[in-house]
Amino acid sequence: MSMGSRYAVKLTTDFDNPKWIARHKHMFNFLDINSNGQINLNEMVHKASNIICKKLGATEEQTKRHQKCVEDFFGGAGLEYDKDTTWPEYIEGWKRLAKTELERHSKNQVTLIRLWGDALFDIIDKDRNGSVSLDEWIQYTHCAGIQQSRGQCEATFAHCDLDGDGKLDVDEMTRQHLGFWYSVDPTCEGLYGGAVPY
């Protein structure tokens, strides 16, 4: 299955970049639901399925599809069920995931983040028009707890609306998240409107 992306992204990694490290440290702490300095796949799935999907009103089928994508994505970074992962293990797992995902993207192959994006868009695209509006984006980010202010949501939306049509498609979101989380693409700086560093 080919991604067929319309958008180029920086394909080289910069794992020593303080911005890349700060972004992932922020998310590690955000995802550490019980604040014990360790995370596991149980916590990811609980947050994704029992909190976010439930708040968004996802169907059982949508929740199962989304959960599989979360399992595959975070599994790609080395997370497992019932096995705690520390920060050093987490960041090393992200290095492996980033390399693998960028390699897939460079070959026009489907990435785990794209599969997750497809599953997520199916849930948040409430009017079923194949794109996400600003209001749909705001609802999702509030349910996920990533962004709380409208300004942060609007900043991310504008940053991801690469074709300037006032709506987001999954290709735009995938491209920006590849650049932000994997390669520190300078065109992706400020992606989360300040909710996530840099």
Curated annotation (Swiss-Prot):
<feature type="domain" description="EF-hand 1">
    <location>
        <begin position="19"/>
        <end position="54"/>
    </location>
</feature>
<dbReference type="InterPro" id="IPR002048">
    <property type="entry name" value="EF_hand_dom"/>
</dbReference>
<feature type="binding site">
    <location>
        <position position="34"/>
    </location>
    <ligand>
        <name>Ca(2+) 1</name>
    </ligand>
</feature>
<feature type="binding site">
    <location>
        <position position="161"/>
    </location>
    <ligand>
        <name>Ca(2+) 3</name>
    </ligand>
</feature>
<feature type="propeptide">
    <location>
        <begin position="1"/>
        <end position="8"/>
    </location>
</feature>
<keyword id="KW-0106">Calcium</keyword>
<dbReference type="Pfam" id="PF13499">
    <property type="entry name" value="EF-hand_7"/>
</dbReference>
<comment type="function">
    <text>Ca(2+)-dependent bioluminescence photoprotein. Displays an emission peak at 470 nm (blue light). Trace amounts of calcium ion trigger the intramolecular oxidation of the chromophore, coelenterazine into coelenteramide and CO(2) with the concomitant emission of light.</text>
</comment>
<dbReference type="GO" id="GO:0008218">
    <property type="term" value="P:bioluminescence"/>
</dbReference>
<feature type="binding site">
    <location>
        <position position="127"/>
    </location>
    <ligand>
        <name>Ca(2+) 2</name>
    </ligand>
</feature>
<feature type="domain" description="EF-hand 3">
    <location>
        <begin position="148"/>
        <end position="183"/>
    </location>
</feature>
<feature type="binding site">
    <location>
        <position position="136"/>
    </location>
    <ligand>
        <name>Ca(2+) 2</name>
    </ligand>
</feature>
<keyword id="KW-0677">Repeat</keyword>
<dbReference type="GO" id="GO:0005509">
    <property type="term" value="F:calcium ion binding"/>
</dbReference>
<feature type="binding site">
    <location>
        <position position="36"/>
    </location>
    <ligand>
        <name>Ca(2+) 1</name>
    </ligand>
</feature>
<keyword id="KW-0599">Photoprotein</keyword>
<feature type="binding site">
    <location>
        <position position="125"/>
    </location>
    <ligand>
        <name>Ca(2+) 2</name>
    </ligand>
</feature>
<keyword id="KW-0479">Metal-binding</keyword>
<dbReference type="InterPro" id="IPR011992">
    <property type="entry name" value="EF-hand-dom_pair"/>
</dbReference>
<feature type="binding site">
    <location>
        <position position="43"/>
    </location>
    <ligand>
        <name>Ca(2+) 1</name>
    </ligand>
</feature>
<protein>
    <recommendedName>
        <fullName>Mitrocomin</fullName>
    </recommendedName>
</protein>
<feature type="binding site">
    <location>
        <position position="165"/>
    </location>
    <ligand>
        <name>Ca(2+) 3</name>
    </ligand>
</feature>
<feature type="binding site">
    <location>
        <position position="32"/>
    </location>
    <ligand>
        <name>Ca(2+) 1</name>
    </ligand>
</feature>
<feature type="binding site">
    <location>
        <position position="167"/>
    </location>
    <ligand>
        <name>Ca(2+) 3</name>
    </ligand>
</feature>
<feature type="binding site">
    <location>
        <position position="163"/>
    </location>
    <ligand>
        <name>Ca(2+) 3</name>
    </ligand>
</feature>
<feature type="binding site">
    <location>
        <position position="38"/>
    </location>
    <ligand>
        <name>Ca(2+) 1</name>
    </ligand>
</feature>
<feature type="binding site">
    <location>
        <position position="131"/>
    </location>
    <ligand>
        <name>Ca(2+) 2</name>
    </ligand>
</feature>
<feature type="binding site">
    <location>
        <position position="129"/>
    </location>
    <ligand>
        <name>Ca(2+) 2</name>
    </ligand>
</feature>
<feature type="binding site">
    <location>
        <position position="172"/>
    </location>
    <ligand>
        <name>Ca(2+) 3</name>
    </ligand>
</feature>
<dbReference type="Pfam" id="PF13202">
    <property type="entry name" value="EF-hand_5"/>
</dbReference>
<keyword id="KW-0455">Luminescence</keyword>
<feature type="domain" description="EF-hand 2">
    <location>
        <begin position="118"/>
        <end position="147"/>
    </location>
</feature>
<dbReference type="InterPro" id="IPR018247">
    <property type="entry name" value="EF_Hand_1_Ca_BS"/>
</dbReference>
<comment type="similarity">
    <text>Belongs to the aequorin family.</text>
</comment>
